[in-house]
A protein has these predicted regions:
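Long, charge-dense accessory insertions within large macromolecular proteins
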Residues: 2-48, 52-71
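Hydrophobic alpha-helical segments, chiefly the membrane-spanning helices
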Residues: 32, 149-153
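Short, ordered coil/turn segments that flank beta-strands lining enzyme active or ligand-binding pockets
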Residues: 49, 116-117
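Regulatory sensory and allosteric helical modules in signal-transduction proteins
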Residues: 49-56, 68-97
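Short clusters of small/polar residues that mark proteolytic maturation junctions
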Residues: 58, 125-126
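Short, Lys/Arg- and Gly-enriched loop/turn segments at beta-strand edges
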Residues: 101-107
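A short, hydrophobic, proline-anchored segment that marks a local hinge/packing element in signaling
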Residues: 109-116, 125
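Conserved small/polar residues in nucleotide/adenosyl-binding loops
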Residues: 137-142
Length: 153
């Protein structure tokens, strides 16, 4: 195992935290949704290629806690096995599956894999509340039973 001196470790950790804080500020600046710029109903994090969270912003635990599972499931789905292409530069993964790391269908996770030298380096991830994701008249319809009625999987 490689050891890292404490100063280098702290510089790298704070650098990753700064990236996540800048992600958060950029999303607020660019958002047209009051759920984001008024209610802060979103969360940001960075993940390594093994789906381990390496940095997160000070956000909602209900968003942040299940995000590693969402990233893991996305990596599993796009692993290059079972006939799929695998994750490649330029891909963007959008998911809201309540059974694979989602919270409810309106919390949509966006992953943008970043490659360095042709190798997957890091996954910036954002989970945000999307007010009207459903296929029916309202995303909170109490009489809907199948998950697909509320927004598709």
């Amino acid at each position: 195992m490689t050891t890292v001196d404490p100063i280098t470790l702290e510089v790298v950790c704070e650098g990753m935290r700064a990236i996540v804080k800048e992600m958060r500020a950029s999303i607020i600046r660019a958002s047209f949704s009051s759920a984001i710029y008024e209610l802060d109903d979103f969360s940001c994090a960075l993940f390594n290629p093994q789906a381990d969270m390496v940095a997160q912003s000070d956000d909602h635990p209900g968003h942040v806690m299940p995000m590693p599972w969402s990233v893991f499931c996305a990596m599993e789905d796009f692993s290059g096995q079972d006939g799929n292409e695998g994750i490649e530069p330029g891909d963007v993964i959008l998911l809201n599956d309540a059974y694979r790391g989602g919270t409810h269908l309106n919390d949509v996770t966006l992953l943008y894999p970043v490659f360095v030298g042709g190798e997957l380096f890091i996954f910036p991830a954002v989970r945000a509340h999307w007010a009207d994701v459903c296929l029916l008249y309202t995303s909170d319809a109490a009489d809907d039973t199948p998950c697909v009625d509320l927004g598709g999987r």
